[in-house]
Structure formats: structure tokens, C-alpha cells
């Protein structure tokens, strides 16, 4: 079986004894300049030449590194694992891909040299740490069983790289740097050309190995919010050889070990910086964020990762020792890897400055926690579960991984956290997701109220323990044009109490999961998704529990008690709710973004949520007015009974009440009392307020007394009377029908709006008709209605849905709006019940049939008998064989039945509902050929509103003249 274990392969003969040339001593050349000393005769080239990107890394040309990056000051030597003491031999796979015929060969020198054995390999090993940890040969065999073809870069993948054999002179002009290109695991099992090995052996004898092993670098202080993902490819297409050879080498410069597949999650918590890249990979809130730039965009070259001197500012230093060496005469590229995506929240933020502006924005004058340690992984858990999940025998921080390749980002010197708690067994072998601790798993997304007061978040687990593909989908490459609504992941369901301020606070808190779009996009690019949090008020509801004490905030300052309200049935609960709202609001205010962060749009969701947080209720019952509708009744006593305080909170039932509470019918003549459980089952409420009755009959009986106090119920009743008056009044009906018909013919489907400034003006319209109108009716098309959707809210959506369904040739939509003015409530009335939908206007709409005829035509004279239309219905022309037996006769009778029904339905008559006896006779005629005498009915034509006489003769012969006159003959037959 072909061996593909990366650490064992990297210590093979391919990577040892190759000459190392200091990149800092070379002069600057153009990216595409070829410095290969070509022989007089072309050297032979084996088509089985290794195309592995890891092998080609050993054939680097130092001239490609135009701006080498000197290493930082070396820290104290850390303890690292030694590599395996027994590297293994590999056999060549017969499935090695051949080099393309159209590409020129990479220059190499003959003669042939045999591969070396294990003795030569042991001579040049890098000195490891005396601290040894056991390797796992049994699990290493799992990696050796992988088929090498499955490790090839697939042609359909987003990160595939073209072959590295470039034709001379084909280099395109240099383009601006486009960010790191993701590394692709490739074939490592192909024996390289013997000519290449010979050349490597000769050139490596004159180079003394460097003993500088710097696997950890001192990380600069930076406070980024997000980091790019592992597959963020800046190129918009598959890289061609020109792209690979002509990219700015500094963007491809690496200085650390490359990660393995399972070690992505090990280092995902480390903050780092990256060269400039496309905007969709950096979601920051600073105004100096990246502008979208790709490889074809003009821009200044990237100057490095950190703000320290470079080649032109300080003398070069020796490069750190790498396990492999480099050729001095090969032109190729560097395989690059990026660390996985990791969003974490630092104390402060810093912008990723654009290449052509100052790199870092001035920070706030407050002190930053410079010595704060970010744990990249729970090392205690990692050691305990290392045996369960290790496929590659060494982590990335060990020398074998340092030999394999450099890191493209800065790393941190981290210390393991002390005393890890007991662990639960993991159901999968991954090391990136932490198992919950026993009795100590207090997460920041907990449902507990105590954990909200003292969250104690553990930031190493941004993703829950879910299926592996769900975690991978969260770090995939985002679309350049932004995620479409269909392609986005569905938001997390939020279970909250009825306080809108509480929801706004949790949505803006730092524990909320935010996905921010690129700067300058539309308003829909920002998602505020709150984790699944449930805050119940049952624990705070009890009167005997202390609720007025100050809560201890995480900052250490106690919460001042809120102003007291008059003692009443709900005063203790009201204080508890206000304390909860203000406490969560203060927690959120402390974690808001700094002042330099760009504000959202004028009507963005974030601005609305913050406005809701900053607003305070006008009175003690203001919080209840913001609460949504509550369907179940939940407070003792009747809401119709006037209370001394007159608060709206007392008038609305409470959904969190106990089942032992009682509910009383609001009808004064009934006063039936039921338990809360039974009341929630069958009690009925007023349509406009929270007044409950034991049945619909009691609600109807109490309406005359209830509407005197229910303002919104009374105004809603006025709207219904106006709609009915527009149907019944002939002049109003004809006038509105003409306006609606003309509006439809000129502007398409729409709604006819009729507004009244007060309920009194609506009463004048009911008394005087068109003469009592203060505002003329207005026709708005559906397109114009969409522009006014914001103030109308859900009512606009209902109107739009009805406007798409109504039939303009038969009816029109009429919307009646009545403003609830100060004169709506009668003076001296009792306490008003809390409305369900408080607002300045009550709106209702209905479909109204179009009036028949012209409004200017005088009505027909009542003196004589009006002429009545007569309709005779027989089988359609061409129908024969009604008396035949079997399927043929049944089919003919069925066609006759369909024809009769169709003619009547065109006039708005439905036999099955209006004349069921005639319908049954026709069904028996079709099924059993049972004849019946001609039947006469007198239905009403819905198109004209006039009755007509209809004679149904189902078994008679078809009329001969209808054969010519029928315009829908084919439809009648079919």
C-alpha cells in the first residue's frame, strides 16, 4: 500500500542534503526573471517527474523572495516533540499523473544517483527537545492506508492549482498581491527524477546546516475581530502557470509549520494578521476595512504582516532552519496554507487598513490588556484525548511538522490552563470541539438566569458539538456577491419573554451570533441572530421572594433599585421586570463597539434595536403597551373590573400565572368563574382588547356595554359599518366602483383607500353619504402600495396578498381607515382595557362587487314588470348517444352535465349549493341514465344582480343553431 504519512515522507531522502541559500542576500529581481544556468544541451526530463507541491518546495529559487521577511527576536526555546526515529521507505505509485506534453520541463542536471538509505537520513536530523511523548504507530497506520489518488487536488474543487511546469517566456506581467493561496495536499509518493537527486546531492555538500530552529514567534499586539477561513482563495479562477510564477513572492512567504487536517481546530483560537484580500473574507466594523480587491485590481503591494522594518530598513538576519532545503536555480511557487476561520471577541478592535491608507487606525486612549492570554486549545483535554483522534503522530508545533512547511501567519506562545476538570467521553475523535465538563459546563449561551448575571464564557468553543459537516459549512468560502437569502443558513430560533427591550439587548449583546456583510451593501446584509435563550419570569413573579435588592453586575457595581410604583397586585412583578430589562441593557451597553465603528443605516436593524434600548416607557404601563398579543388568559379576576391604579398592566392577563388562578367571565349577567386551565381552553376574548368571556354568546350580549369603554372595539365597529354602507348605498357603490374600475384599467391591480380623520366624520358619512366625505377616496396600485409598506406594517402585506387574488372584472378592494382621536373616548368613562394592537388608526378592508351598468343611467321604471332573461340549457351541439349503454353513453351524458354547469357558473350560479335537488337529478341522469322532465329555476346573475329564468333540458336533442353560434365548442366537448 502506498504510504502517505506526511511526517514520515518529509524526512525522506527527497528533502535532505539540499543546498540552502539565504534569501536575504539576493538582489531584487522581477518576479518572472529566470536565473537558471541552462546547459548547452537540453537535459533529459522524465515524464514521471514528481508534481508534488511539497517536493517542489525544496526546489525554491531565492530570487523569488523579493522582500524576505527577517525573523523576530527568538523567544526562549520551547519544548517540542522529536520526530519519529524510524522513517519509512516509499514505493512509487503506478497511478502517478504524467506531465502535460505542451509544457516545458523544469531544468535539472543529470547524472543519476541511487536513493539513500536510513543511515544517511539519521545523520541530519534536527535536534529535538529532551521531552518525549509517545508516538502512536498503530494509529499512524490508518494514514498509511489512504489511497494516494484520493489526496490529489480535484479538478472541480475551488482550490485546485495548475501544474507547475511553465513554458519559458510565458509569464504574464506582475499583478497586485491577492492574499495567500490555500495549500492543497498532493501526491507525495512519486519517486522524483534521479537527475534531480544527483543535482541535489552535489549542491548540498557545500552548505552547512543551520541549527536555528524557531517554531514559535512572538505575536504582536493586535485586536482583530475575525480571521479568514481555510479556503479563502483570492484568485477568481484556476491559477495558471503564469499566475503561479508571477505572483508577488512576499504574499506567499511562510515562516512556520503547515497544519494537518485535524490540527486546523487546534490553532483556530490564535489571532493573527493576513495580507490584503477580498472583502468578503474580512467582516469588520471599522470604516478603514478592506475594499474589495482581487488580483486584477490596481493597488500597492502588501508590505508585510507586522509594523516592523523590512529589508530596506534593517540588515537581514539568517532565516530559521527548515527541514528541507532549497535549490538555487529553480523557478516555482510556494504552497501556502491559511488557518481556519475563527471569530472571537477581543477587548478592543483594530481595523485592517487598506493597502493605500495608514495601516492601523489610532486607538482609544484607554489602556489595553496587553498581557492577556488567549488559550488556543484546552491542553489538558488535548493530552487526554490525543490517543483517540490522532491520525498524524505530531502536532504542528513539533519539529517534524516544522520540516514539512512553514506557517503563513504569526503564532503565539501559549500556556496550558491549570487544572482541567473531568471530561466526558467524546462521541467523535476530533480535537477541536470540547466535551462538556461534569457539573461545570456553564456556557455563555445557557438558559439559566444565573449564568446571564455571571456568564463566565469559554471562548474556545464557538461552534457547538454538532455534525462535522455543519461546522465545516460555517467556514466555507463565502460568495463574492454576498450570500443570497436562499443560500444563507437559517437563523437560530429565539425564545424570549414578551419584553421587546430584553430581546433588543440580547440581540446586541456580544454573545449574539452576528454575520455582517461587506461595507456598503444593502440593509439586508446584517443579521442579528440571538442564541436560543429562554428567560422566564416565574422565578421573579413570586411576591415573597426578594426582588428589590441590587443585582451584582460583572463589573462589580451594584444596580440601583428602580423607582417604586404604587403597591398593587402586580407592583412586585413590575419591579422585577424593570430590573431585568435595565440589567440586561447595562450588560449590553458595556460591550458595544467603539466610537470609530461605522453606524448602520438610518433604518437599519441595529439602529432600531439600540433606539428600543435607549427608550424608556412613558408610564408604569408603558412596557405592557410594547408587549405583543397574549392569547391565553392568565390573571385572576375579570379584566373588565376597574382597578384603583388604572394601569394597563392590571387590565391584561398574565401568561405565566399558575393553573390554580381563577378567571371570571366579563359579562355582568353571567360572572362564571373557571380555573385557569379551563379558561385557557374555551374562554373567548374581545377582538380588540384583553377582555375575556366564557362563550361567544356572553361576548355578544355584553357588546353594548363593553364598546362604551373599548375604544378600539368601537372604532373597529365603525369601520365595519362603513364597509357595509358602501355595499348597500347605490350612489356610493356606483361611485366607488367607477373609481376602482378606472384605476385598474389605468394603473393595474390596486386598492381603493377611504380615510376618516375621526370616528365622528365616519358617522357623518353613514348619515349623509357622499356629501359627508371629508377626504376623497384614493386608488393606489400594488406597486405604489409597496412604497407605503413601512408605516402600514403587516396590514400592507395583507392588502398585497388580497390584491394579487381578487378578480378585477368582478370586484374591487376597499380599505377603510378611521383615526382614533382624543374625542373617541367618552368623558368620564371607566378604565379602558388594554388594546391588542395599539396604534393611531384602525384599518379594515373587504372585497366589494362592482356595480352593474353606468352610474349615470337611470334605474328601470318600477311600474311595469321588468324584462327577465331566459336561458335554455341543452346538451352541446354534436353530442350524440345519450341513450347508449356502457361507457360511451355515460361519457356523452357527462359532457352534457359539464356544459350545463359551465353556463351557470359563468353567471355566478352554483347548482350544488343553490339548487341541490336539481344537482342530484343531473347526477342520477349521468350515472344511471334516469331521465327527468325539463326543470325551471330562477337564479340571480351575479354579473348584473338581476334574476333570470333558466330551463334545464338535459335529455333533449341539442339545438341546431348552437352548433354555429357556440364559441367554446371545443371546451364544451372536452
UniProtKB/Swiss-Prot annotation:
Ranges of compositional bias, category Pro residues: 69-79
Keyword Lipid biosynthesis on entry: no
InterPro entries (alphabetical): Apical_junction
One GO CC term on file: adherens junction
Protein location: Apical cell membrane; Cell projection, Cilium; Cell junction, Adherens junction
Ranges annotated as biased composition (Basic and acidic residues): 116-134
Sequence ranges of Low complexity compositional bias: 623-636
Omega-N-methylarginine sites (modified residues): 322, 749
GO biological process entries: cell-cell junction organization
Membrane as UniProt keyword: yes
Segments of skewed composition (Polar residues): 201-216
Chain's role: May be involved in the control of adherens junction integrity.
Listed name of the protein: Apical junction component 1 homolog
Amino acid at each position: 500500500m502506498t504510504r502517505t504519512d506526511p511526517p514520515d515522507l518529509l524526512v525522506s531522502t527527497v528533502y535532505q542534503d539540499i543546498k540552502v541559500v539565504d534569501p536575504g542576500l539576493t538582489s531584487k529581481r522581477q518576479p518572472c526573471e529566470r536565473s537558471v544556468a541552462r546547459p548547452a544541451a537540453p537535459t533529459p526530463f522524465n515524464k514521471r517527474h514528481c508534481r508534488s507541491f511539497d517536493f517542489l518546495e525544496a526546489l525554491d529559487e531565492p530570487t523569488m523572495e523579493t522582500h524576505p521577511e527577517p525573523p523576530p527576536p527568538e523567544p526562549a526555546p520551547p519544548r517540542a516533540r522529536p520526530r519519529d526515529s524510524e522513517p519509512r521507505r516509499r514505493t512509487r505509485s503506478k497511478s502517478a499523473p504524467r506531465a502535460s506534453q505542451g509544457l516545458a520541463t523544469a531544468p535539472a542536471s543529470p547524472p543519476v544517483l541511487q536513493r539513500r538509505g536510513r543511515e544517511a537520513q539519521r545523520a541530519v536530523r534536527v535536534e529535538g527537545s529532551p521531552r518525549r511523548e509517545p508516538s502512536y504507530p498503530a494509529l499512524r497506520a490508518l494514514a498509511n492506508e489512504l489511497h494516494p489518488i484520493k489526496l490529489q487536488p480535484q479538478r472541480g474543487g475551488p482550490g485546485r492549482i495548475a501544474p507547475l511546469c511553465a513554458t519559458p517566456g510565458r509569464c504574464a506581467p506582475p499583478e497586485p498581491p491577492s492574499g495567500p493561496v490555500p495549500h492543497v495536499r498532493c501526491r507525495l509518493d512519486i519517486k522524483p527524477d534521479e537527475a534531480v537527486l544527483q543535482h541535489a546531492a552535489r549542491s548540498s555538500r557545500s552548505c552547512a546546516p543551520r541549527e536555528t530552529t524557531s517554531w514559535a514567534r512572538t505575536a504582536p499586539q493586535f485586536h482583530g475581530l475575525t480571521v479568514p477561513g481555510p479556503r479563502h482563495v483570492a484568485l477568481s479562477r484556476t491559477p495558471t502557470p503564469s499566475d503561479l510564477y508571477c505572483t508577488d513572492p512576499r504574499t506567499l512567504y511562510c515562516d512556520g509549520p503547515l497544519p494537518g487536517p485535524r490540527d486546523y481546530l487546534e490553532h483556530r483560537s490564535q489571532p493573527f494578521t493576513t495580507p490584503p484580500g477580498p472583502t468578503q473574507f474580512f467582516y469588520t466594523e471599522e470604516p478603514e476595512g478592506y475594499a474589495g480587491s482581487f488580483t486584477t485590481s490596481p493597488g500597492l503591494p502588501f508590505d508585510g504582516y507586522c509594523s516592523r522594518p523590512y529589508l530596506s530598513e534593517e540588515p537581514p538576519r539568517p532565516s530559521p532552519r527548515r527541514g528541507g532545503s532549497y535549490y538555487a536555480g529553480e523557478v516555482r511557487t510556494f504552497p501556502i496554507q491559511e488557518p481556519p476561520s475563527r471569530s472571537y471577541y477581543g477587548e478592543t478592535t483594530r481595523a485592517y487598513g487598506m493597502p493605500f491608507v495608514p495601516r492601523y487606525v489610532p486607538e482609544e486612549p484607554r489602556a489595553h490588556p496587553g498581557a492577556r492570554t488567549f488559550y488556543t486549545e484546552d491542553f489538558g483535554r488535548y493530552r487526554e484525548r490525543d490517543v483517540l483522534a490522532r491520525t498524524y503522530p505530531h502536532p504542528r508545533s513539533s519539529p517534524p511538522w516544522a520540516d514539512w512547511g512553514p506557517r503563513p501567519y504569526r503564532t503565539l506562545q501559549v500556556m496550558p490552563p491549570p487544572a482541567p476538570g473531568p471530561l466526558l467521553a467524546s462521541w467523535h475523535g476530533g480535537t477541536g470541539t470540547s466535551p462538556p465538563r461534569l457539573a461545570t459546563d456553564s456556557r455563555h449561551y445557557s438558559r439559566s438566569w444565573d449564568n446571564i448575571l455571571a456568564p463566565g464564557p469559554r471562548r474556545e468553543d464557538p461552534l457547538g458539538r454538532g455534525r462535522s459537516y455543519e461546522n465545516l459549512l460555517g467556514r466555507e468560502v463565502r460568495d463574492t456577491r454576498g450570500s443570497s437569502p436562499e443560500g444563507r443558513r437559517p437563523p437560530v430560533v429565539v425564545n424570549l419573554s414578551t419584553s421587546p427591550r430584553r430581546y433588543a439587548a440580547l440581540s446586541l449583546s456580544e454573545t449574539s451570533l452576528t454575520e455582517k456583510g461587506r461595507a456598503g451593501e444593502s440593509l439586508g446584509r446584517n443579521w442579528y441572530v440571538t442564541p436560543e435563550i429562554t428567560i422566564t419570569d416565574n422565578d421573579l413573579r413570586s411576591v415573597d421572594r426578594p426582588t428589590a435588592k441590587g443585582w451584582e453586575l460583572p463589573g462589580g457595581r451594584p444596580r440601583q433599585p428602580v423607582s417604586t410604583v404604587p403597591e398593587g397586585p402586580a407592583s412586585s412583578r413590575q419591579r422585577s421586570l424593570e430590573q431585568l430589562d435595565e440589567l440586561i441593557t447595562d450588560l449590553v451597553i458595556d460591550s458595544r463597539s467603539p466610537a470609530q465603528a461605522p453606524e448602520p443605516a438610518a433604518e437599519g436593524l441595529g439602529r432600531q434595536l439600540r433606539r428600543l434600548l435607549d427608550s424608556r416607557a412613558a408610564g408604569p404601563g408603558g412596557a405592557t403597551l410594547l408587549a405583543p398579543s397574549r392569547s391565553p388568559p392568565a390573571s385572576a379576576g375579570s379584566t373588565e373590573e376597574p382597578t384603583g391604579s388604572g394601569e394597563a398592566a392590571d387590565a391584561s392577563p398574565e401568561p405565566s400565572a399558575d393553573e390554580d388562578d381563577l378567571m371570571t367571565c366579563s359579562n355582568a349577567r353571567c360572572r362564571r368563574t373557571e380555573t385557569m386551565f379551563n379558561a385557557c381552553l374555551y374562554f373567548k376574548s374581545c377582538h380588540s382588547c384583553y377582555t375575556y368571556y366564557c362563550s361567544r354568546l356572553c361576548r355578544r350580549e355584553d357588546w353594548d356595554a363593553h364598546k362604551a369603554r373599548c375604544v378600539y372595539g368601537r372604532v373597529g365597529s365603525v369601520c365595519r359599518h362603513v364597509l357595509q354602507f358602501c355595499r348597500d348605498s347605490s350612489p356610493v357603490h356606483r361611485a366607488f366602483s367607477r373609481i376602482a374600475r378606472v384605476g385598474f384599467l389605468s394603473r393595474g391591480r390596486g386598492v381603493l383607500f377611504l380615510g376618516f380623520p375621526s370616528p365622528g366624520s365616519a358617522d357623518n358619512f353613514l348619515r349623509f353619504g357622499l356629501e359627508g366625505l371629508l377626504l376623497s377616496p384614493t386608488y393606489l396600485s400594488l406597486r405604489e402600495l409597496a412604497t407605503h409598506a413601512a408605516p402600514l406594517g403587516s396590514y400592507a402585506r395583507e392588502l398585497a396578498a388580497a390584491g394579487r387574488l381578487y378578480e378585477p372584472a368582478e370586484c374591487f378592494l376597499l380599505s377603510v381607515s378611521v383615526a382614533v382621536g382624543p374625542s373617541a373616548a367618552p368623558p368620564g368613562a371607566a378604565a379602558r382595557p388594554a388594546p391588542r394592537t395599539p396604534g393611531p388608526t384602525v384599518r379594515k378592508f373587504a372585497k366589494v362587487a362592482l356595480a352593474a351598468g353606468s352610474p349615470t343611467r337611470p334605474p328601470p321604471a318600477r311600474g311595469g314588470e321588468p324584462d327577465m332573461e331566459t336561458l335554455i340549457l341543452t346538451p352541446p351541439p354534436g353530442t350524440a348517444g345519450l341513450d347508449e349503454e356502457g361507457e360511451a353513453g355515460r361519457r356523452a351524458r357527462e359532457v352534457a352535465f359539464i356544459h350545463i354547469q359551465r353556463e351557470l357558473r359563468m353567471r355566478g350560479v352554483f347548482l350544488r349549493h343553490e339548487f341541490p335537488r336539481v344537482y342530484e337529478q343531473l347526477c342520477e341522469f349521468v350515472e344511471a341514465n334516469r331521465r327527468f322532465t325539463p326543470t325551471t329555476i330562477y337564479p340571480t346573475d351575479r354579473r348584473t344582480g338581476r334574476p333570470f329564468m333558466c330551463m334545464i333540458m338535459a335529455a333533449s336533442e341539442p339545438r341546431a343553431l348552437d352548433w354555429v353560434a357556440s364559441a367554446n365548442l371545443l371546451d364544451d366537448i372536452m
